[in-house]
């Protein structure tokens, strides 16, 4: 492996693979590492991810690696694409093998398991304050990205030069548009809250409530996202962009979203456990709901939709009762978004 590798991707699931394919299509040498050697070996043999993206062949410049140390030393820039509940553990695993000049970017959407901390806080605690960090977030379904369909996304970095470099690496005038955003907190937060609201939109559709109700949930969900962001110091305008409204609309309205499909099953009377089993992949919003609630409680921010979804997922509340609780709330002015 040589020094011309532009990026090492940690995580060979559907999203990690699709981002690696995108970078390789842009003419960059990319290393893709996964924790399961058998899975990575299969990717190398058939030159595609048959499990998640069976119709997309790997470009020649996408290199597979089973040795973590070789993968991490191949490139200065490391893209972490793993579920949020293992994000911290993965950073601990890679830390001893990072190069002195390494920089970390993640496309993981969510918060730290159980604590609800932002992933930037997890990264700083594990990796220290000196290493440059960045986050990639926005409305991206892996299959469409891997197929080269037009997509737009946001990047935020702790160092401007790092953000500029990432924008240049990922940006492709034919299909992939990348917007820089200086709001590091807001870009992270949008990707976590939208998962929760997408479950709610799915529940609503599963109950047969229709397009009016779904749109109301999206709109009021955006208000909850913005309130929490403001309390944490985010720029409110971020939530009208790719990492906020863009990702929220995508995951609330399209059945490629696991969170939405999970919610639809709940709305149809399927149990939480059975719905997770039927999805067959990680439903980020399940854990994100608990984490967002913890974060909102610490920030003293009211998030009624997120609270009712938490009650359904973790307190066995009936979906009809949860819907009635939201519809029966006190009358308010729409502009009263600061507190409620």
Curated annotation (Swiss-Prot):
UniProt keyword NAD present: yes
Gene Ontology BP terms: carbohydrate metabolic process; glycerol-3-phosphate biosynthetic process; glycerol-3-phosphate catabolic process; glycerophospholipid biosynthetic process
Residues reported to bind NADPH: 14-15, 35, 109, 142, 258, 282, 284
Active site annotation, chain numbering: 194
UniProt-listed Enzyme Commission number(s): 1.1.1.94
NCBIfam families for the chain: PRK00094.1-1, PRK00094.1-2, PRK00094.1-4
Protein name: Glycerol-3-phosphate dehydrogenase [NAD(P)+]
Organism: Photorhabdus laumondii subsp. laumondii (strain DSM 15139 / CIP 105565 / TT01) (Photorhabdus luminescens subsp. laumondii)
């Amino acid at each position: 492996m040589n020094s011309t590798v532009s990026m090492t991707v940690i995580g060979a699931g559907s999203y990690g693979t699709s981002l690696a394919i995108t970078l390789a299509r842009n003419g960059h040498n990319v290393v893709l590492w996964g924790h399961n050697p058998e899975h990575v070996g299969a990717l190398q043999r058939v030159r595609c991810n048959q499990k998640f993206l069976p119709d997309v062949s790997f470009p020649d410049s996408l290199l597979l690696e089973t040795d973590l140390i070789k993968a991490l030393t191949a490139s200065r820039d490391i893209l972490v694409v793993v579920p949020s509940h293992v994000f911290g553990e993965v950073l601990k695993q890679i830390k001893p093998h990072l190069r002195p000049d390494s920089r970390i970017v993640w496309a993981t959407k969510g918060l730290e398991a159980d604590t609800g901390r932002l992933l930037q806080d997890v990264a700083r605690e594990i990796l220290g304050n000196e290493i440059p960090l960045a986050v990639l977030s926005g409305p991206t379904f892996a299959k469409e990205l891997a197929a080269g369909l037009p997509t737009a996304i946001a990047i935020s970095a702790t160092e401007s030069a790092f953000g500029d470099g990432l924008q240049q690496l990922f940006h492709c005038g034919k299909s992939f548009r990348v917007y820089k955003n200086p709001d590091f907190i807001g870009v992270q937060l949008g990707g976590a809250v939208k998962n929760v609201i997408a479950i709610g939109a799915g529940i609503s559709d599963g109950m047969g409530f229709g397009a009016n109700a779904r749109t109301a949930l999206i709109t009021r969900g955006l208000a909850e996202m913005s309130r929490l962001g403001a309390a944490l110091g985010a720029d409110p305008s971020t939530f009208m962009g790719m990492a906020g409204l863009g990702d929220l609309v995508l995951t609330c309205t399209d059945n490629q979203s696991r969170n939405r499909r999970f919610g639809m099953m709940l709305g149809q009377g399927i149990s939480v456990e059975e719905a997770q089993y039927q999805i067959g992949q990680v439903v980020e919003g399940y854990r994100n709901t608990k984490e967002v609630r913890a974060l909102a409680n610490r920030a003293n921010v009211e998030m009624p939709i997120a609270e009712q979804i938490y009650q359904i997922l973790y307190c066995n509340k009936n979906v009809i009762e949860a819907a009635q609780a939201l519809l029966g709330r006190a009358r308010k002015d729409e502009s009263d978004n600061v507190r409620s």
